[in-house]
């Protein structure tokens, strides 16, 4: 599903542990790391897409996490020209994302990034809150910065409990 402006609706998932560290996942066969994310189907709400993607990409069920924050609006990034699929219609020029900050409520061993036939990730680790800004691919960096900045008050509230 691509909107009239060429953006694919998507959810971004930031999983935080009790120490304030974030789950950082390595894309299959690459040395590229990112937060889990995925498209919103036409018959889904962003929350439904969040939980579907959470299960597919990280192996967690809704009862194993708690939503502690989400971005107010859509955050957009454009794909680099080399990544555009000009033969697909309508043309997708980027993604618009709703970001969710989740508190993980289960042991680390519950995380399973390779539990599907075609996993997105082949590894993961916990990193400090701002670490991803120095590591994510350039075209996603501004969206990551905006999401982390908007969600940090929710992270602080959780850590103060």
Curated annotation (Swiss-Prot):
SUPFAM superfamilies attached to this UniProt entry: Nudix (SSF55811)
Motif annotated as Nudix box, chain positions: 38-59
EC number: 3.6.1.-
Any Pfam family the entry gives: NUDIX
GO molecular function, one term: mRNA 5'-diphosphatase activity
Highest rank taxon of the organism: Bacteria
Enzyme class: hydrolase
GO CC annotation, single: cytoplasm
Coiled coil: none
Keywords: Hydrolase
InterPro entries from the UniProt entry: Nudix_hydrolase, NUDIX_hydrolase-like_dom_sf, NUDIX_hydrolase_CS, NUDIX_hydrolase_dom, RppH
Physiological role: Accelerates the degradation of transcripts by removing pyrophosphate from the 5'-end of triphosphorylated RNA, leading to a more labile monophosphorylated state that can stimulate subsequent ribonuclease cleavage.
Name by which UniProt lists this protein: RNA pyrophosphohydrolase
Organism annotation: Marinomonas sp. (strain MWYL1)
């Amino acid at each position: 599903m691509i909107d009239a402006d060429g953006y694919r609706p998507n959810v971004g998932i930031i999983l935080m542990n009790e120490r304030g560290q974030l789950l950082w996942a390595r894309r299959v066969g690459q040395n590229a790391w990112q937060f889990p994310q995925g498209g919103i189907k036409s018959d889904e709400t962003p929350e439904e897409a969040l939980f579907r993607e959470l299960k597919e990409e990280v192996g967690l069920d809704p009862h194993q996490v708690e939503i502690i924050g989400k971005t107010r609006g859509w955050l957009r990034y454009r794909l680099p020209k080399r990544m555009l699929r000009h033969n697909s219609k309508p043309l997708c020029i980027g993604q618009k994302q709703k970001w969710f900050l989740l508190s993980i409520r289960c042991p680390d061993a519950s995380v399973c990034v390779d539990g599907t036939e075609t996993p997105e990730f082949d590894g993961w680790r916990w990193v400090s809150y701002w670490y991803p800004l120095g590591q994510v691919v350039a075209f996603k960096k501004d969206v990551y910065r905006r999401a982390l900045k908007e969600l940090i008050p929710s992270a602080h509230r959780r850590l103060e409990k």
